A protein has these predicted regions:
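Conserved acidic
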Residues: 1-659
Length: 659
């Protein structure tokens, strides 16, 4: 249903849209009177606009339901300025309401920072460092548990919307930083419609204010050059319609020299850094400094130059406006700079930047730094810039969401790690990274923090500690540290581990047994199908004098489905054990299951004793090998080395590459 004229005239959203469009249409149709443009836009809004019905719910106020329209909600937001959550939840700001639980969170945040500060005064391999690192992690867990509790129905302050708002805001923030990094570092925020270009154009030529004169840099006068750059910036070729061509052409041909220059350098980092002014500043930084390890503690003798580099970059390169479809872009679009996204972090590829400085600055600056320090200085130059960039970005995000200035500074991202190499996987939150710097401090070779592993199976709970340590060593020494990866060396070490597992199992050693978190029957919906339940059940039936108490984490022997006749064959040698197996296992409450499937899992008590000799011949060696080495499969898959299946249970790594 068309909008009535009064609603068009009184809607803050529509009137704001008209004001924006007037600016654009005056460029597209310079001879058309502004009054006619405004009238036409108002007519379009009235004939094509729809005021969608909306509902505002407050479940802190007896589930109050307010039925309204989307335009009225927008006007209310503009007038009342509530804090906007990531999922459309509105909050009163701290000047209008107080929250005791918020003070608890702020207290925990302050405590965590204090622990981190104290931690960093100690050597990274010391007991004190580990203690304060553990304490700051505990504080973080407490903070996150408070957030999560709001989504738990049993919590006194449970709210249907609050937990989702926290998650939605975090997702919105991380996607906002990701697309901004893509745009800033690699000009990779493509236009998905001509409307996006028009908004981009309007922000640069009409909305933004600038500190420096465009005349300080090479002036761009070639309109075709600017047009070609942005015409090739559409996400897909089918967006390059005749209408889009006409609009872009008219807008760019309406530009002054200053507007062309500012359009050319926006999100065009390397072109801008190649200008004489920026080259002089960058070479000056490298000529004057002897070491630049921490972007948050710039050496005094280059502070002025670094501040000026950022000021120029902020003025000419950084586009500090929201991009549309941020979350969708994050999930679906091909990225160039943001190579890994974790819950609250973006990991960015800065190799192009380091290569750029290596080719244009290192030698030309006359720097006396060695290659390592030149690399660190290059890394921290861009870290300094992106730290300032993301600070400005998040400040504007908070302002747009009506967060009070004094609270906005709490939403921030910091540069924490410099990873020299990363091994990625085709699964989210799974990577291995060789750490060189943490907050400016060099991570020594052999330090516990040298290799950061997240999400890979061989580091997860339940994996044998011996296997985990050996596979970790292969990853570190054969893949992450070397400049070139030797596949033959990796396979040789894996083969050695496999032979060691086989030899160990044949001798009844528990060294390479799987580790399971065994629980009572009530913890499982179908306990009879869970190896973690059946394993201690078998042990307790056979060895009641050394009973296992659950819940507990236990070493578990994988058996090859031992059937009743095989057990009966041992009656002469192990009469008591066989009798108990017959009575309590094969003919006990779960007898039918054991008679059909056989004995597959046997738990061992945490005494350190070896596997009882009675079971040695029944150990499923192939399955145990595959289950242990299989935890390394995602690492090898990242190197395009697949596991080869041989038989039902046995897998091994071959020397065949997936290409």
């Amino acid at each position: 249903m068309p909008l009535d004229r009064a609603k068009v005239d009184n809607s803050m959203l529509i009137q704001g849209w008209i004001e924006d469009c007037v600016v654009d249409f005056k460029r597209l149709y310079p001879n058309l009177p502004e009054k006619v443009i405004r009238q036409t836009l108002a007519d379009v809004a009235a004939s094509h606009g729809h005021d969608v019905r909306a509902v505002i719910c407050n479940d802190y106020d007896d589930d109050l339901m307010l039925y309204c329209t989307l335009l009225s909600v927008y006007d209310w937001i503009q007038k009342k300025k509530p804090i906007l959550g990531g999922n459309g939840t509105f909050f009163r700001d701290q000047d209008k309401a107080s929250s005791p639980i918020a003070n608890v969170i702020l207290g925990r945040i302050a405590a965590r920072k204090a622990f981190q500060k104290e931690r960093d005064t100690w050597d990274q391999d010391s007991y004190e460092y580990a203690y304060f690192d553990m304490m700051q992690k505990e504080a973080k867990i407490k903070i996150n548990s408070i957030y999560g509790s709001f989504g738990t129905t049993s919590f006194q302050l449970y709210n249907y919307y609050t937990a989702a708002a926290t998650t939605g805001t975090a997702q919105s923030l991380i996607s906002a930083t990701a697309i901004s990094f893509e745009a800033f570092l690699s000009d990779n925020a493509k236009f998905k419609s001509i409307d996006e270009f028009v908004t981009f154009f309007r922000n640069i030529t009409n909305r933004d204010t600038y500190t420096f004169s465009y005349l300080e840099f090479p002036v761009i006068k070639d309109r075709q050059k600017v047009f070609d750059r942005y015409w090739n910036h559409f996400f897909t070729e089918d967006l390059k319609t005749d209408t889009a061509y006409e609009i872009m052409h008219k807008l760019i041909w309406s530009c002054s020299e200053e507007e062309l220059t500012r359009l050319w350098y926006k999100n065009n980092l390397y072109t801008f850094m190649s200008t004489p002014t920026m080259m002089r500043l960058l070479r000056g930084v490298f000529a004057k400094t002897e070491s630049f390890r921490n972007p948050n503690a710039v050496p005094d003798n280059i502070q002025a130059e670094m501040d000026l580099i950022w000021a120029y970059t902020n003025d000419f390169v950084f586009y500090n406006h929201a991009y549309t479809e941020r979350i969708n872009r994050l999930v679906h679009d091909r990225r160039k700079s943001v190579i890994v996204i974790d819950t609250d972090s973006n990991m960015i590829n800065i190799e192009p930047w380091v290569d750029f400085l290596k080719d244009n600055v290192w030698t030309q600056s006359g720097s006396t730094m060695d290659d390592d320090n030149l690399t660190y200085a290059s890394v921290n130059c861009i870290a300094f810039l992106v730290t300032h960039m993301v600070r400005s970005l998040l400040a504007k995000y908070c302002k747009d969401c009506n967060v009070l200035d004094r609270m906005a500074s709490r939403i921030n991202m910091k540069n924490e790690f410099y990873y020299a190499k990363m091994l990625l996987a085709n699964v989210k939150k799974r990577y291995a990274a060789l750490t060189k710097l943490q907050e400016g401090k060099e991570i020594k070779v052999g330090s516990k923090k040298e290799l950061d592993v997240k999400g890979y199976d061989f580091r997860k709970a339940g994996v044998n500690e011996e296997i985990s340590a050996k596979l970790f060593d292969i990853l570190l020494t054969c893949i992450m540290r070397p400049d070139e990866v030797s596949v033959s060396r990796i396979l040789s070490k894996l083969d050695f581990i496999e032979k060691d597992i086989i030899q160990s199992l044949k001798q009844g050693k528990r060294t390479y047994l799987l580790r399971m978190n065994c629980k009572v029957a009530a913890a499982y919906s179908k306990p009879e199908s869970m190896g973690a339940y059946l394993a201690p059940l078998l042990w307790n039936a056979v060895y009641p004098e050394n009973e296992i108490m659950v819940p507990d984490k236990l070493d578990v022997v994988i058996l090859r489905g031992v059937k009743e006749p095989e057990i009966l064959a041992l009656k002469d040698k192990y009469p008591d054990e066989v009798e108990r197996i017959e009575k309590y296992i094969f003919h006990g409450p779960l007898g039918e299951r054991f008679r059909n499937k056989g004995l597959v899992y046997l738990a061992l008590p945490n005494t350190g004793d070896d596997i009882p000799e009675m079971w040695w011949e029944f150990i499923d060696i192939n399955k145990t090998v595959a289950r242990n080495l299989g935890t390394f499969e995602p690492v090898m898959a990242a190197l395009n080395i697949p596991m080869i299946t041989s038989g039902k249970e046995y897998k091994y790594f071959g020397n065949i590459l997936d290409i």
